[in-house]
Amino acid sequence: MVKYISILGSTGSIGTSALDVVSAHPEHFKIVGLTANYNIDLLEQQIKTFQPRIVSVATKDLADKLRTRISANTKITHGTDGFIAVATHPDSNLVLSSVVGVSGLLPTIEALKAKKDIAIANKETLVAAGHIVTELAKQNGCRLIPVDSEHSAIFQCLKGENNKEIEKLIVTASGGAFRDKTRDEMQTLQAKDALKHPNWLMGAKLTIDSATLMNKGFEVMEARWLFDIPYKKINVMIHKESIIHSLVEFIDGSVMAQLGAPDMRMPIQYAFHYPTRLPSSYEKLNLLEIGSLHFEKPDLEKFPCLQYAYECGKIGGTTPAVLNAANEIANALFLKNEIAFFDIEKTIYKTVEAHHNVKDPSLDAILEADQWARQYANELLIKKR
């Protein structure tokens, strides 16, 4: 069966990897829609290669500019409405949500309402509104298929298993660019230092989140919703080689793990062709060459953002959305070298502390909390600049 796919965030690292997968298996995958924010040069190339029916960009000016450069019969839209139009296009049956940040939330929700299966790589959607997204998926008979390597690993380990027999999930983490640094050393490090991820090729925002371990915190929160597992049953383990992507321990003591080379095209391909597998020409895992694998506990004093994620997830309500929004603001300013590395964790902590949580929030309440947190975090950081 051919999958007809729309990709939200086609010019990012996940989006370009996804298009590599489509190119490798044109008989199985066809592109219906693509979205990008500002990188219309790359989007132009993608349109010419994949001939989508519809694309969307951030602004009207960019859409007008793109129209002058495209002769293909592709509809060009813009803004949130344009992203939603791509996500809900009637010809697609699978939507890859790979945009960065909470901007992926509304298109994902509308795609679920349109009864699309979601290959989800946008952590923030489940962090901010996991209860809404998972309930919508159930109501509309849609599948949420994880794309992150860690969640894909758990998803694969649980295939054919009974979730009631899970003892715990073990989410692995590389440790990020600063894993071998002391707190004193980290204090003066800049964005260019954090962007040197030891194992994975990722976008800038995600690489900074990896350096703070906030990315792993988000993955814990994502796992809670994807697999309907309480936080007390989700552990994190540092695994520097990034070969074991995650593990599941069962009540009888058995442990299942999924291993593979650190290449995002593999979990993307699995999500695209689920529930069956396709051959690939990607690098194969050779354990004899690797020789040994190493594991250790995460240091929560050194990386407090991971602990913040656990605490905010347990509180629930609008607090996870506030955590995410404060992180997005601080992360972006650190990337611009306008604040110090430790200002990220301080901003998150102060913003969450100032928030008045709303339990069982509506989508509007989540979006309102998101906007409040962005403004509050910005005001905190104005004093730092």
From Swiss-Prot:
Cofactor dependence: Mg(2+); Mn(2+)
Root EC class: oxidoreductase
UniProt keyword list: Isoprene biosynthesis, Manganese, Metal-binding, NADP, Oxidoreductase
Pfam entry (one): DXPR_C
Disulphide-bridged cysteine pairs: none
InterPro entries referenced in this protein's UniProt entry, alphabetically: DXP_reductoisomerase, DXP_reductoisomerase_C, DXP_reductoisomerase_N, DXPR_C, DXPR_C_sf, NAD(P)-bd_dom_sf
Positions bound to 1-deoxy-D-xylulose 5-phosphate: 123, 149-150, 174, 197, 210, 215-216, 219
Keyword check for Metal-binding: yes
Catalysis performed (reactions): 2-C-methyl-D-erythritol 4-phosphate + NADP(+) = 1-deoxy-D-xylulose 5-phosphate + NADPH + H(+)
Gene Ontology process terms (BP): isopentenyl diphosphate biosynthetic process, methylerythritol 4-phosphate pathway involved in terpenoid biosynthetic process
Binding site for Mn(2+): 148, 150, 219
Listed pathway(s): Isoprenoid biosynthesis; isopentenyl diphosphate biosynthesis via DXP pathway; isopentenyl diphosphate from 1-deoxy-D-xylulose 5-phosphate: step 1/6
Highest taxon of the lineage: Bacteria
NCBIfam families: Dxr, PRK12464.1
Family to which the UniProt record says this protein belongs: Belongs to the DXR family.
Function noted in UniProt: Catalyzes the NADPH-dependent rearrangement and reduction of 1-deoxy-D-xylulose-5-phosphate (DXP) to 2-C-methyl-D-erythritol 4-phosphate (MEP).
HAMAP family cross-referenced by the UniProt entry: DXP_reductoisom
Protein name: 1-deoxy-D-xylulose 5-phosphate reductoisomerase 1
Gene: dxr1
